[in-house]
């Protein structure tokens, strides 16, 4: 199993970041890469929620919310095996954890994933996910429109 991870310190308290992150149905509101996102029938903010996401590289990715914990500021989601994802990774599960600093209004954003891939693809896929997580964290922490 391969893994990718990005941790970044941001000068923002965890609460507003968590409000954006925990709203699984509205990541398109802050994530520049996502041009289209709609929720599948069923729950929208609890485990089992499924969104169908479109982005320039993956026009129809089905992402499933596995866990959400407001107390620990932790959220886990994954990509459903069907339809086929254009990224050659399988059993993809990502976790985003916000770690509040105690001495000032700042947060460590820890975005990580574990996945299976073919031998020899680990570096290429790892670099892709690291670049995406950097982009996601920048989008998450950028000023939001009113």
Placement of each model-derived feature along the sequence:
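Intrinsic-disorder/low-complexity, polar/charged segments enriched in Ser/Thr/Lys/Arg/Asp/Glu/Gln
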Residues: 2-7, 50, 60, 74, ...
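Hydrophobic/aromatic beta-strand elements that line small-molecule binding cavities or substrate pockets
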Residues: 6-8, 61-67, 91-101
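Beta-strand/loop substructures that line and gate deep hydrophobic ligand-binding cavities in soluble
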Residues: 82-138
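Hydrophobic ligand-binding cavity/cleft-lining segments
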Residues: 1-43
